[in-house]
Amino acid sequence: GLAVDSTDLPVCRAYIERLESQGGKYISSSKWNNTVLMQVPDEAIALRFLDNSFVRSIKKVWVSPDSIMPRNKDRKEQVKNQWKKQDDYYGMGAEQIKIHHGDSLHLAGFKGKGIQIAVIDAGFYNVDAMKIFKNTTILGTHDFVNPSSDIYGEHNHGMKVLSCMAVNTPHVMVGTAPEASYWLLRSEDNDTEQPVEEDNWAAAVEFADSVGVDIVNTSLGYYSFDDPIDNYTYRQLDGHTSLMAASASYAAKKGLLVVCSAGNSGMDEWKKITPPADAEDILTIGAIDNMGVNAAFSSIGNTADGRIKPDVMAMGVHSAVVGVDGGTAFANGTSFASPIFCGLVACLWQACPWLTVRQLIQVVHEASDRNAYPDNIYGYGVTDMWKAYQLAMKLKADTDGK
């Protein structure tokens, strides 16, 4: 077990009640970062919060949008649940698993059973209506953007991300961790791009920790916001400046493995990874094609403090996903490279539950094809997951022998 420290204590309830008495509406808090999210009708009330001795600073993170896109009330009618069977057991998902020898882990009986994965994303459109998810174990859902919304009526991005790991329909599509259990958490508001989404993410990852999650996949990243004053600079990619990176770094200290997409800014002026991909002791995943060549759009490292990023690469070009109609489709993005790899790491952790987060990351690095010469494009390269398993077994034998 891990020692309890001050970051395990909730934000003082008396402080929250004081802010409420001054006109604030409580939304959420982060015990790890010692922050609280309050909604106020005007800025003057927020400024009065500074009169309290327990308030160090305030920051505007959300402005109510002028309009919100209407949700599709007839969403389930979009689902056709039609697909073609393939000869290969993995169906459309074969290439993205076999490029890492993930099928060897599966053949050895390690398909993620007993591992809990939280997917923190933008919505899980129609997952509840798609037969292709019928063999997927979903433990629960929570919406940190709008707790009263229908998480299955929100954006389809999280559904596609989930499918890379969780689908278990042989000869149609089998994901990388078909026997793991999943929490579906929404932190991303697709209608706007505001810093509050970092607060939502911080609340979501702390919730994941509280319910016993082992691994978090997040195919989200932020550096540019609706108000340019909130934008990050490269110098801030230090693993601690952004709230999300700080929370992801804390998660690692609490024993959670965070697997994160590198970002799709490789061809933009920004080019770099996006927070929380700069966090410490997490796995940041870039995108390759089925030949192992990096995707031009895949964001590059390193972090501002010189750590190698991305960590490793997975298929993010022509990745097999579930489409909005419930059939299989292909998509591009580090958003899909991340869950593909996340599922494989879940299988590895099932096989080697004695590994710490840092040891997991270590064997992943050592089992990758550029381990001897990592760079800021490929990181440590493409991981052989069977080799990672063998290295983990050797590590245990060496440790037990001492």
Residue spans of the language-model regions?
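Aromatic- and Gly/Pro-rich amphipathic surface segment
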Residues: G1-Q22
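Substrate-binding/access-modulating region of protease and related hydrolase catalytic domains
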Residues: H106, N168-H171, L184-D278, M291, ...
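Autoinhibitory propeptides
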Residues: I16-I97, G102-H106, E280
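Solvent-exposed loop/turn segments at secondary-structure junctions
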Residues: N33-N34, E43-I45, S64-D66, A122-N126, ...
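Hydrolase catalytic cores
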Residues: L162, L185-D189, K272, G316-Y378, ...
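Structural recognition of the beta-strand scaffold that forms the well-ordered cores
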Residues: S28, T35-Q39, K59, Q116-D121, ...
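Catalytic-core environment of secreted peptidases
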Residues: K131-T141, N290-S335, A372
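Subtilisin-like serine protease catalytic core
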Residues: D103-H142, P147-E197, V211-D214, D227, ...
